[in-house]
Amino acid sequence: MSKVIRIAVLVDTSTGWGRRVIRGIADYATKQTGWQLTVVESGRDEKLALGRGWQGDGVIARIGDLEMYRELKAFGKPVINVSAIELKGVDFHRITGDVRTAAEAAVEHFAQRGYEHLAYCGLEDLQYVARHCEAFEAAAQARGFSCEVYHPSQRQGQSGW
């Protein structure tokens, strides 16, 4: 009998992005022998953490702050970071999407539908959102399209609209 490999998945379950990441991990895990996933449910502003005493073999996590990094580092097992957030000193292996290719695909999607005047909306004070915005603007400009940018306020209770 093969050994069961226990993997914790610490990804925000309240967002479409997080659920798609979990779906991708689960799809991969079903093709492996002996993988057992523990998905830690959480909302957007909730702290993602391993339960006390969890005895696993590794973690796949969206590491968004140094506190989480330190906790997972102390765990002493392999960790894969799926966050686009770049934190100084975080040295786990990281898997993220290709921002440039995604931006080019988005611009191509609009181009195929006849749009030439595009816009990007995102919270500018989030570094990974800024990278997405820059890539989208560059892809639009490379096609000769105009691109407006709107950065709504992130302050709680203020929609920015």
Residue ranges and their predicted role:
Residues 1-58, 68-161:
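Bacterial carbohydrate/catabolite-sensing allosteric modules
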